[in-house]
Amino acid sequence: MRQLAALSAVIEEGSFERAAQRLHVTQSAVSQRVKQLEERLGQTLVVRTLPIHATEAGQQVLKHFRQISLLEQELRAGLSQRDARGFTRVSIGVNADSLETWFPDALSHLVQHEQLLMDLKVEDQDATQQLLKDGEVIGCISSSPKAMPGCLCVPLGVIPYRCLASAAYLERYFPHGVTAEAFRRAPVAEFSHKDQLQNRYLQQFFGIGPHEYPRHRIPSSTAFCDMIVRGLACGMVPEQQGAPLIASGAVQEMTPGRYLAVPLYWHVWNLSSNLVRRLTDELVAEAARQLDPFDVHPRLTHPG
């Protein structure tokens, strides 16, 4: 297990030096443990660049180690043998908009009462499943309804996304109305190159391709909304964040009645784990309180 723990630390920290600091051993000891594990398995497990990252084989070993660690942590908890400080670490993949809205409410009870340390990895809702596939997380929030092998897929609910803009932005870029021609000259905000919501909205309602309009990339939900309020861009905003901005008059919906309904699902390892069950129960319960039911939206926006 020491060799597996060393591999996990190196991949998570991105370097042998930081892994050594985390494990409270020398850098050479960490390097030796990883090398011994590679020799034992006959596979290269990490690519020794900066930052260090796992090979495909390393990802599979890491996934196996994390599953074992989760079950071991549960056993220790049952025997009152958590780590030295009494915490259990849990890695989850989540999209930025969920993290800014309903997701913290879902986890607050468990984090406080189960003494969990959360390691949240933020990705677009179309891309979080890759984190699960690579073994980086035990579960993820995703817009895909397709369960991966060895995992469960639990429906959570739907988030409506609406294209919002300020009055100043509309006056500058859309003086003659919201048209496809005007969109081709107007800057649009996107979270990252993986964010496809703007592309889908413009393709679905205006027939505009993904490279036919200027865009800002803003990898922060808060800054994303701020750019829109300042009149520097328009963009797809989840209803929970957008509704107060609309009510205050800071922004308005560009095309009322035209929106994207993004479904969310909880994908998690299919383990006989009390922690996995409790996580799932908390997420489902909070989603029922804060997200829309699936049957409210006849057309859902799945990854393409």
Please give the residue ranges for each predicted region.
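A short LG(V/I)-centered, amphipathic sequence patch enriched
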Residues: E38-E56
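Residue cluster at the C-terminal edge of the helix-turn-helix DNA-binding motif
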Residues: E13, R22, Q36-T44
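C-terminal regulatory
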Residues: C153-L232, I246-Y259, R289-G304
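A late-sequence structural motif
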Residues: P256-L300
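Alpha-helical linker/hinge and terminal dimerization helices associated
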Residues: R40-L41, V61-D83, L283, Q290
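Short helix-boundary/capping micro-motifs
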Residues: S8-H24
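Central regulatory/effector-binding core of bacterial HTH transcription factors
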Residues: R85-P149
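Residues within the DNA-recognition helix of helix-turn-helix
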Residues: T26, R33-Q36
